[in-house]
Amino acid sequence: MDLSAAAALCLWLLSACRPRDGLEAAAVLRAAGAGPVRSPGGGGGGGGGGRTLAQAAGAAAVPAAAVPRARAARRAAGSGFRNGSVVPHHFMMSLYRSLAGRAPAGAAAVSASGHGRADTITGFTDQATQDESAAETGQSFLFDVSSLNDADEVVGAELRVLRRGSPESGPGSWTSPPLLLLSTCPGAARAPRLLYSRAAEPLVGQRWEAFDVADAMRRHRREPRPPRAFCLLLRAVAGPVPSPLALRRLGFGWPGGGGSAAEERAVLVVSSRTQRKESLFREIRAQARALGAALASEPLPDPGTGTASPRAVIGGRRRRRTALAGTRTAQGSGGGAGRGHGRRGRSRCSRKPLHVDFKELGWDDWIIAPLDYEAYHCEGLCDFPLRSHLEPTNHAIIQTLLNSMAPDAAPASCCVPARLSPISILYIDAANNVVYKQYEDMVVEACGCR
């Protein structure tokens, strides 16, 4: 099977399979690029220690060499996150620490206007290129917002542009402060619309100038065929008879509103609220599709390099899964002992630890934070009489009673999560935007019998 065929097969699997199978198909797709698959702990068995999501789902991490050149891994200083093509904007990192309740004491306050009703916050980095001739007329900002879901409600949008202090921007430099004018960009079929006008206050040091552009973003999305790019133009005027003023005289820089560093470029922060329940599997599938497109553009691997074929990878994973299932069956059955003996060796339904390590899953090239968390899981017997704290349903009570009287007549009720809570994740989406999103039902808070 050639590489493009393997990619097509895996993308079909991702569109049709269950989440567990989807995780495995994503791992196969990633492994199809190069290098043999290795298990999370470096060994081949399901050894001791606490269970992790990688072990529970049967997912395997792959070496960085298995990822196409466009997503070659590099480890950021002081962070476990790795991605060679995207540098997370410092504002999005600060936003995550603030909204996730992880801001350290004394950390700078983060503007949260419009974020209260949002469950998703996306940071779009400026993609415009500037030249010196544009410095006299203004500065344009260009954002590709095509990744926003049409069904999502935009509850807030803010343009943030870095401004540095300069001799001409300090106190006493002007008899009256210059005006900053923010408008939409002129186009072939539309005239520019003034969005914002305010005084450029004297500045010592540096700060991020923030402009509310929520109404402009909503109008952009209401267009019959909205363009992919959302374009804004910042200008300055000064004097009794307002005349154009070069923005760099007020401390604005180039390219992208601050400097050559990615974290200094202007950023459009869009807060939205989804109309559907978000599934982490949807983002995993999008990541795999984007990776599949990159894999299809890569040259075919040299057969002499020891690269594992997709067929060999699938076969190897199937053998490992079968061996693991056999081990669990032997452990759960007590090596062929009767049903009653196995039951006596198990505890009642309760919450047990389940540590999720995204690095172990190989997801640290798109998940920025957190890199691990405690998810918990439910395990144990639901036998008669059921305890009230397990919050059994009436159906579970009847089923458990029947099972206690005649085990062959009805199976025991199941120990499952009864209450779950969300976590917030900061990640890079398939369009290379940094996204803060709250995912429901990620942590087990209580278990019950159902």
Curated annotation (Swiss-Prot):
Basic residues bias (residue ranges): 340-349
GO biological process, one term: gland morphogenesis
Main localization category: secreted
Any one GO MF annotation of this record: identical protein binding
Pfam families: TGF_beta (PF00019), TGFb_propeptide (PF00688)
Gene Ontology CC terms, in alphabetical order: extracellular space
Annotated region (Disordered), positions in chain: 296-349
Gene3D superfamilies (alphabetical): 2.60.120.970, Cystine-knot cytokines (2.10.90.10)
Record localization: Secreted
UniProt xrefs under InterPro entries: Cystine-knot_cytokine (IPR029034), TGF-b_C (IPR001839), TGF-b_propeptide (IPR001111), TGF-beta-rel (IPR015615), TGFb_CS (IPR017948)
Glycan attachment residues as annotated in the record: 83
Signal peptide (UniProt feature, chain positions): 1-19
Keyword Manganese belongs to the record: no
Propeptide residues, chain positions: 20-321
Family membership: Belongs to the TGF-beta family.
Assembly notes: Homodimer; disulfide-linked.
Function: May play an active role in the motor area of the primate neocortex.
PANTHER family in alphabetical order: GROWTH_DIFFERENTIATION FACTOR 7 (PTHR11848:SF160), TGF-BETA FAMILY (PTHR11848)
Protein name per its UniProtKB record: Growth/differentiation factor 7
Classification lineage: Eukaryota, Metazoa, Chordata, Craniata, Vertebrata
Gene name per UniProt: GDF7
